[in-house]
């Protein structure tokens, strides 16, 4: 049975209209021109004047690209660029080891040890720097005190049990004991002058240095018998260095005393001699 044209239009199958596909927007990174030039700006369909004629998306892309183009790239230092090229070509990198004036100033400002500075000052004044095992002669008023150099500006010497008096002083003469002390050379000097004096090296052969130091350190803090004539500070240090306890200071004093005594005896003898009778 057929349908009338009117009925066909009324009961005909109606399909929804599908809009045609829209064109894909151009990619932001796509560019038809050269690599370093910005993409061409598209005009809006609606006529406008000035900036209004550019779409917001196109304006943002163009401004951002212009900003990137206007910022100059940071150039590396010439030396760094040349060094990088030389390394890429297989050459070895050269490291400069020269010190700058600022580095030298920093090193010179480092404080040196106090003892080392004093020894350097003494060497500058022409005084030889003591070596381990050297004998130190200290010039006191009326006598000489002796010590033996050990290390680090320190010496070993004889001192009375009481620190109020020095060995060799009038008070210590009547004491028969002394203690072996390990002290700084500056503390032993008490402002007196001193010198290195190994005067018996030409008479006796010094012991090996390591043996001298070993013997000396074993005596530290020990109490020994003290005698101005037979066991004073010079006897002590000569015994450690040469193995022979000897004191030329006492020998000279005894010799001078013998000479003086001889002169006195000679004068007395001459005075008691009978005088010849003259006519």
From Swiss-Prot:
Please provide the Gene Ontology terms (biological process) for this protein: N-acylphosphatidylethanolamine metabolic process
**Purpose:** Exhibits both phospholipase A1/2 and acyltransferase activities. Shows phospholipase A1 (PLA1) and A2 (PLA2) activity, catalyzing the calcium-independent release of fatty acids from the sn-1 or sn-2 position of glycerophospholipids. Shows N-acyltransferase activity, catalyzing the calcium-independent transfer of a fatty acyl group at the sn-1 position of phosphatidylcholine (PC) and other glycerophospholipids to the primary amine of phosphatidylethanolamine (PE), forming N-acylphosphatidylethanolamine (NAPE), which serves as precursor for N-acylethanolamines (NAEs).
What is the protein's name according to its record?
A: Phospholipase A and acyltransferase 5
Under the GO molecular function aspect, what terms does this record hold? N-acyltransferase activity; phospholipase A1 activity; phospholipase A2 activity
The protein's superkingdom reads Eukaryota
Entry GO terms, CC: cytoplasm; cytosol
Which InterPro entries does the record match to this protein? H-rev107_PLA/AT, LRAT_dom
Q: Which gene encodes it?
A: PLAAT5
Q: Which Gene3D superfamilies match?
A: endopeptidase domain like (from Nostoc punctiforme) (3.90.1720.10)
> Which reaction(s) does its UniProt entry say it catalyses?
a 1,2-diacyl-sn-glycero-3-phosphocholine + H2O = a 1-acyl-sn-glycero-3-phosphocholine + a fatty acid + H(+); a 1,2-diacyl-sn-glycero-3-phosphocholine + H2O = a 2-acyl-sn-glycero-3-phosphocholine + a fatty acid + H(+); 1-hexadecanoyl-2-(5Z,8Z,11Z,14Z-eicosatetraenoyl)-sn-glycero-3-phosphocholine + 1,2-di-(9Z-octadecenoyl)-sn-glycero-3-phosphoethanolamine = N-(5Z,8Z,11Z,14Z-eicosatetraenoyl)-1,2-di-(9Z-octadecenoyl)-sn-glycero-3-phosphoethanolamine + 1-hexadecanoyl-sn-glycero-3-phosphocholine + H(+); 1,2-di-(9Z-octadecenoyl)-sn-glycero-3-phosphoethanolamine + 1,2-dihexadecanoyl-sn-glycero-3-phosphocholine = N-hexadecanoyl-1,2-di-(9Z-octadecenoyl)-sn-glycero-3-phosphoethanolamine + 1-hexadecanoyl-sn-glycero-3-phosphocholine + H(+)
Q: What are the UniProt keywords, alphabetically? A: Acyltransferase, Cytoplasm, Hydrolase, Lipid metabolism, Transferase
Identify the PANTHER family for this entry: HRAS-LIKE SUPPRESSOR - RELATED (PTHR13943), PHOSPHOLIPASE A AND ACYLTRANSFERASE 5 (PTHR13943:SF2)
Q: Where in the cell is it found?
A: Cytoplasm, Cytosol
The residues annotated as the active site are: 145, 157, 233 (acyl-thioester intermediate)
Instruction: Report whether Repeat shows up as a keyword of the record.
Output: no
What are the LRAT domain coordinates in residue numbering?
135-249
**Which stretches of sequence are listed as region Disordered?**
1-53, 70-117
Query: According to the UniProt entry, which residue ranges have a biased composition of type Polar residues?
Result: 97-106
Question: Under which EC number(s) is this enzyme classified?
Answer: 2.3.1.-, 3.1.1.32, 3.1.1.4
Q: What family, per the record?
A: Belongs to the H-rev107 family.
Expression by tissue, per the entry, reads: Highest expression level in testis and pancreas.
